[in-house]
Amino acid sequence: STTGFQIIGGAVLFLILEKNNVLAGMPVKEQILCSLFHSVTARTAGFNTTDTGALTEGSKLVTMILMFIGGSPGSTAGGIKTTTVVVLIVFVRANLMEAAGCNVFNRRLDETAIRKASVVMCTNLFLILTGTIFMEIMQPFSLSDVMFEVFSAMGTVGMSAGITRDVCMASRMVLVFLMFCG
């Protein structure tokens, strides 16, 4: 269900944000298929049917979120994994409601699982922010393009905003390091 929500939600947002941009001029059926394809591939393989460098800022953000979350455990997709996100959402919800514990489907979440999910999320965010800052110091590209490259590297997706070929060697090393960490 988490994967379905990600795919459908990502596709709908991509379609809305790109209808008058990279999807303009395509038949509606093709726009829907491209949106679904983009939503799936942003979490996994990094293939593209549209020019990712020409995406709107909103679409880049949605794509970065999909790359950050990635796929489900057991898949070859990168990212922090859907289960990590679900554990953290349940944890936040339980704390906002001041519940005694975190329960999912009538089962209590173990404190260790919550701790591990928090560490994965915080470590990934730290590496993404650090990588973005290093690349911004060294490169004259827009923040959204640099962040797109960093999220893609960390999520081991392979998508590009089109700047990878033009970055300096130090920035390439940052991206390679993030790929290994991801």
Residue map of PLM features:
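Membrane-proximal intracellular helices of multi-pass ion channels
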Residues: 1-182
